[in-house]
């Protein structure tokens, strides 16, 4: 049995990691198969080392093309070592970010072009797309203010970019959503977290195959 691939996307501070944790606490007992939780950049030993390079605030001279290629390199390793084997084993994979983030951050935010960054990532992933993507929708300024409150002085290199960059990234996400309307589910992330989690769980119960989830 082939597995299923779910990704979570959104601007910085949208609450993806927290929402994913809460969603799994509710839905995991109902899954008929094993599941895997992972993240990007990272998810494997090599990819996590590349993550450290990408997000280190000391690397403030990083060229946009270098950044895009490092993300793609980390993703290639992540896909081959972790994601593809899990899907082939019939597992449900839940990933905190995937290719869509590169299209928004590097394609739109860094002005490299969404089409060009997609081409790089098609090569890196053998054109692997999630079956379902949740976009946690929040205005960039609200997301960034959340980060400053929750972990002041711990912003990574991309989180430290100015609001104009993050606004471009947000616009990039909106473009990507229009490219893949059947795959994306947009959730208002300014709601209380229990409401966000409830909506995500409802969508999962409607969309996951009956071979994977009970009571859907």
UniProtKB/Swiss-Prot annotation:
Entry's Gene Ontology BP terms: dTDP biosynthetic process; dTTP biosynthetic process; dUDP biosynthetic process
Keyword Aminoacyl-tRNA synthetase found: no
MF terms (GO), sorted A to Z: ATP binding; dTMP kinase activity
Residues binding ATP: 10-17
Enzyme Commission number(s): 2.7.4.9
Family annotation (InterPro entries): P-loop_NTPase, Thymidylate_kin-like_dom, Thymidylate_kinase
Entry keyword annotation includes Glycoprotein: no
One Gene Ontology CC term in the entry: cytosol
Catalytic reaction equation(s): dTMP + ATP = dTDP + ADP
Pfam families: Thymidylate_kin (PF02223)
Enzyme class label: transferase
Keywords assigned by UniProt, alphabetized: ATP-binding, Kinase, Nucleotide biosynthesis, Nucleotide-binding, Transferase
Family from the record: Belongs to the thymidylate kinase family.
Function, as annotated: Phosphorylation of dTMP to form dTDP in both de novo and salvage pathways of dTTP synthesis.
HAMAP family linked: Thymidylate_kinase (MF_00165)
Protein name according to UniProt: Thymidylate kinase
